[in-house]
């Protein structure tokens, strides 16, 4: 639609120039008019989003979550078969990056040196898998076989999604209960405490040091989503650590900022090639809170979760951003098209990908063509902006299950050809050394 309007404008401009030249046969005027036309055409083209139907490089990710119980209590060999089947299906659908949840509740779906095995794996927190295996190491190896990136997904502050859940005796909570706060029916690390930040950095250090991950990934859970009628219980922490702040909201944002910066420095200090990515809630700020915000009316990263995502990107503390734009096109409070355009103009010079909800995409019809779902229009919007380098599918199982023929569409149309992941050249601008003195080695 936009390109069509621009073409009409250029045609009208050309007609005007030709008409004027008929009546003003002056060489100097002719040159001026042709130059003006050229400048206007170039200027307009620079403002128009230019899509690429089959990009050579594009982030095509998928989240594999543990918290929905899809792994819990499944025998080891059977679970390995399920994961291999999922990866094969996702590879066929053109997915080139897997974001795998390894730390849902200060626990582990890997052989952690500090935290207990996750109840989402074995059914009971602290219970060792039998026979013993390491899901993260297994997934890394399987992803590498398929030329997929592996992003280790951790939740930094969350400890209990329900106070009814039991923590293993070796859980850090039992050693330092003073580090934690209860909010609603959940338990969290207190983001204000230096001890909380140091501990989370220690966990990331362990993962990055011992595992060949391509990235550390965090989603939208920073300060918890607001519970109606309850303020987060951090008055004591504010009294102790809030010096220099008169506004508690600014102080809370600062607490998260410090963690994000420390995690960036931690990862860079161990393996500079490992990326650090964030997948925040889909609205940064509404216009009613900030004139620079989006024309939306919903919960906000900045004001409600105290996550200043644009600052993190601007300062170079994160290496990519995947806002969760899970709404449909035409949503009254959070329109997909409005948000994609907003994020595209606020990438802050960091790779930007769009988090897509598979169920929501296939559930709603295209407003301009009710006979089809919204996938074609969403993909066109995503690829229309040069600042958007791909997307990530929520959730992997929905793709594998081919909900609404989503996987079929990826294979036949949108991921018809494989794509390399985008280049993160700001992380390392040095080319690898030339290969020297290669030798043939025969193996049995």
Predicted features along the sequence, with ranges:
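Active-site-adjacent "subsite" loops/lids of carbohydrate-active enzymes
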Residues: 65, 69-77, 157-206, 210, ...
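Catalytic domains of carbohydrate-active enzymes, especially glycoside hydrolases
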Residues: 81-108
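Aromatic-lined substrate-binding rim segments of carbohydrate-active enzymes
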Residues: 100, 104-154, 244-270
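Active-site neighborhood of glycoside hydrolase catalytic domains
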Residues: 202-203, 210, 215-218, 222-293, ...
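Substrate-binding cleft of secreted/luminal carbohydrate-active enzymes
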Residues: 306-310, 314-331, 350-426
